[in-house]
Structures are given as C-alpha cells and as structure tokens.
Amino acid sequence: MDIIIIIIDDYYFDLTIYANMHPGGRKILKKFHLKDATDKFNQVKGHGDSFVIGELDKYCVGQVKNIDIEKYIQENYRI
C-alpha cells in the first residue's frame, strides 16, 4: 500500500486508507503525496461543503509547522 499524505491549508492529511474511497481515485491523491494540494482542492466543486470538510478533518495528523512528517511516517508505517 502506498502512503498518501497531502497538505491542505498548511495541515497534513493522511489519506492512505481513504484513498481507495476517493471519488477521483487513488492516483490523483498519490500525485500530491507530501505536496501542497490546497489550490487543486479548492478548485474542485463541492470540496468546500461542510460534509467534505468534516470528513477531511478525520484524517488530519497535524499542522505542517508543528509535525515532523518523516517521523510520523516511520512511527505509523513499516517502511
């Protein structure tokens, strides 16, 4: 399984498990692994809906400036 962690609005979101359920497919999320997807996220119709935001919040692992993402990956995944 590919690890998929993206950045939206300066927060990391671990979408590894969610990726297979994403309506646009896993491939588009993988493209943004460890990259800022804020602009693309905001361009997609419906992404601003409270339901989508609420679902996304479930996968938030921390603010970019406050988390060592490499350490997070090592602690949560066998790589």
PLM features per residue range, with description:
Residues 1-79:
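Histidine-anchored, small-residue-rich loop motif
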